[in-house]
């Protein structure tokens, strides 16, 4: 997974996450400052947000992670965040040095969503 510069090649990870379920829409790996390190939209899907909105949203994801971290000592670390919207389901997973942001179709049952979260965590433990 690492190249000559000891950096992890994120493309195979993002592609692997996107292939977990056919109803996956978008996967982004975000650094702790909110910059998109790698992102892929599933072929045939269109973004519900413009590129500028997507970048702004990723900055907000990083900011919310910082805010949630303030409560780690009293409440424990966040395992993942699951947001249900009318048009899309959003999931955010927090590996150590990156944040994984995923969108999927909203019509997936809860049990399958939990399976997807577990698979994402397994694929991103090294991040």
Q: Where are the regions that the model predicts?
A:
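Non-catalytic interaction/Regulatory regions outside core domains
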Residues: 1-127
């Amino acid at each position: 997974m690492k190249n000559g510069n000891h950096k992890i090649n994120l493309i195979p990870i993002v592609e692997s996450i996107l292939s977990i379920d056919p109803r996956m829409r978008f996967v982004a790996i975000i650094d702790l400052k909110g910059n998109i390190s790698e992102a892929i939209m599933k072929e045939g899907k269109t973004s519900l947000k413009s590129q500028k909105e997507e970048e702004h949203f990723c900055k907000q994801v990083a900011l919310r992670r910082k805010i949630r971290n303030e409560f780690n000592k009293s409440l424990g670390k966040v395992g993942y965040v699951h947001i249900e919207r009318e048009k899309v389901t959003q999931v955010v997973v927090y590996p150590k040095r990156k944040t994984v942001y995923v969108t999927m179709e909203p019509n997936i049952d809860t049990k399958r969503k939990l399976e997807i979260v577990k698979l994402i965590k397994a694929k991103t433990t090294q991040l």
